[in-house]
Amino acid sequence: MSDIEFVPNKNNLANLDELSLLSSVLSEKRICELYELAEFSSGLIEEMLSDGFGIYEALSLISQELSDRVPQIHENHLPENLEMLTSYSKAFSAFDKASFSKLLLKGLRLRGISLSEKDFFEKEVRKESIAYVKNQLASEAYDVFSEAFSEPRLRYANDLREAVNLVLTGEVGYAILPLEEKGGARLSSITEILFNSELKINSVTPVFGALGNADMKYALVSPTVSVPTREIGDDRYLELRIAGENTHKFSELVSAAESLGTELYRVNTLNFSTEDGTLPYFSLVLKTEAGDFTEMLIYLTLFVSDYTSVGIYKNLE
């Protein structure tokens, strides 16, 4: 067996190299077409914004024409190649959508429209008050989170449900909840609380306890997404939840995230009880180092209609 050697056919390799070059030429042509489409779209968005429309309304108008496009496959293909050709076409479709999102943001900024992450979320000034269930680990998390406030106020809750209700009723601005147990696994009970109450993660910090061996993570949560400042060397996270019925949309989203310079940090499958029964969901956490998620948020708004932002946050390690 040791004498067996694999020697690929040089003609096959040369032909594949030539086809790669041709594919590169075609890809650049796609980029040029996408550039013109993005230029036209950015002009339309500029006009809509000047007429008082919001960014969501403007992007939704464009989305109606772009999101349902079906990848085309030539008619003379061999039947046995259809499945692989479909995969290639889907990959090109994901590339097109990510590239269009990038080019659209570039076109808007060239027109003086400084679109950023904050434009995609509700603006709300919240009380500088924080509720949590008193214990050593939660108090350690409070010491970290409270540094972001000028005059933080503390309110103890009897249990996690009360802490959540205090936020939902507006009696306090934020709550502190345990998020991950030792080893990094998400606490399923907290994940369900976030889903049912529609709370957002504003910040995350590790806590270690008096002996230094607890190694859990706690989250600062509120009803609205809070966009943290960007600083050199900061890792920032965008957490999303999408319905698990469409696996193609999930795989396309992951491809787009990579194209737009973000890293897939974590993915979980979840099941939640709703009025329509138990439904599956994907939970994705995307990571960027000192970057932002504006291009990704444009992509999501245009092409992923059923996503939910769970938060943009830093891990305050």
Residue spans of the language-model regions?
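Domain-level signature for soluble enzymes in the chorismate/prephenate branch of the shikimate pathway
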Residues: S2-E317
